[in-house]
Amino acid sequence: MDYRVILLLILEGAFALWLLYRAGLMKKPAYAAAAVILVILAFGARFAVLDYQTLDYQDFLSRWVDYFRRSGGFRALREQVGNYNIPYLYFLALFSYSSISDLYLIKLLSIFFDIILASASMLLLGRYTQSPARRMGLFFTVLFLPTVILNGSLWAQCDSIAVARAVLGVVLARDDR
C-alpha cells in the first residue's frame, strides 16, 4: 500500500478529531483521550480492509476510472459512463488524474463521508441534548456501525455520501434553513 494512502487516512482521522474539537467535545482530558483512542480504533478497522477488492469494484468502478483515465478525465463526462449519479462520477473522473490507486481513493472518499455522516448525526442529536457524552457517543456509534465500516472501507460503496446528505438535510430542515 502506498504511503500516501496511509497519510490520507491519518488526515481523515485528524479531521474527525478536529470536528469533535470544534463541537466542543474535547474540553475534558478524559473525553479527548477517549476520542483519540476511538478514532485510532475506528480508522484501524478501516485500514485493515482497505486492500480488499470486490467484484463490483473490479467489474465496474475500476473500469469507469480507467475509462476516465483513457478518455481525458473530466472531458469524458460528456459520455454516459456507469450508472452512478453525476457528482460521484466527477469524483471518479478526478481520481483518474492521480497516481494513487483508484481503489484506495474510492474507499477514502467513502471514509471521508463516514466522518461527515457521524458528524451530521452528532449535530442532529445536539438539537435535542447538549450532553457531550451522548453526542460523542453517537459520533462513535455511527463510525463503528458494522454497515458503515464495511460499506465504504471493504466494499468501496458510496452509501455514506447519500446518507450524510440526508441527515444534513434533516438538520437544516429542523433549523428552518
Residue ranges: model-predicted function:
Residues 2-59, 111, 144-146, 150:
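Transmembrane signal-anchor helices characteristic of membrane glycosylation enzymes that use polyprenol
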Residues 2-4, 86, 100-119:
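Loop-to-helix entry region of an early transmembrane alpha helix in multi-pass inner-membrane enzymes
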Residues 8-13, 114, 158-167:
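Hydrophobic core segments of transmembrane alpha-helices in multi-pass, intramembrane catalytic enzymes
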Residues 15, 19, 108-129, 168:
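Transmembrane-helix motifs of polytopic, lipid-linked glycan transferases
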Residues 22-26, 120-136, 171-176:
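Transmembrane alpha-helical segments of multipass membrane enzymes and assembly factors
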Residues 30-38, 101-109, 131-138:
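Membrane-interface starts of transmembrane alpha-helices
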Residues 60-69, 74-105:
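Short hydrophobic/aromatic helix or loop-helix immediately within or flanking a transmembrane segment
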Residues 135-173:
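Membrane-embedded helix bundles of polyisoprenyl
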